[in-house]
Amino acid sequence: MKRIAIQGLIGSFHDIAAHLYFEGEQIQLICCATFEEVFANMKKDPTMIGMLAIENTIAGSLLHNYELLRESGTTIVGEHKLHISHCICCLPEDDWDTITEVHSHPVALMQCRQFLAHHPHMKNVEGEDTAGSAKMIAEGQKKGWAAICHAEAAKLYGLKVLENHIEDNKHNFTRFLVVSNPNKADMLRPLMEANKASIVFSLPHEEGSLSHVLAILSFYKINLTKIQSLPIIGHEWEYLFYVDVMYNDLTRYRQAIDAITPLTKDLTILGEYKDGKQTN
């Protein structure tokens, strides 16, 4: 049985993404309060797998997770893109006219601003987790309180769904990375099926240094799908570049990496894996 460390509780979006990615397999979830705790658990138990959100189509990148990933020494072995849909739920005996507060993670509240604007009498209260808000209301029998979470979390904690799909943007997806100890990577993903890679590097503080790297990737027909820069602490105006690329020829990809390595500093391959499917 695979043991998967996630941030959040049972019923959270990490839980849903993990079960979809490992569909048909037996898994045991290790629920963690923070992403730091996810990597700490993996360090203590090298057989453990981690799953963490890395970017959202509305909220953008989770910048801190890039740093945690790079510093952890783990490797990316897969990804999953999950459609994010929210519902508002409450205790079975409550209804619209009794709700005075709505609790959820601040990002979830932000993603439902238009819906909440139509219910100004509901006080918005930020919590640490979408599923955690549902659990708190259910276990504490918080009358007059509602939670914004996934419908599966509402069902799990026995809450009544007042309305589903309340998110402002229906094209809201979060990309999750699956990470493991490098020594276990080949057991979790066949390298020959990989068509995507995540790399990180810094560059000399010289004119055109980034464009030279991008030109080489283009020459080798490597498709750049994402680039994210983060400042290097203690080095003013210098940056780490986190880059995702896709390829259909492993040899040509390897040649491209060999070609850009002399132009970069501290280039690290964070993972080579198969482009993840997107679920609605």
Task: Name each model feature, range by range.
Residues 1-280:
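Domain-level signature for soluble enzymes in the chorismate/prephenate branch of the shikimate pathway
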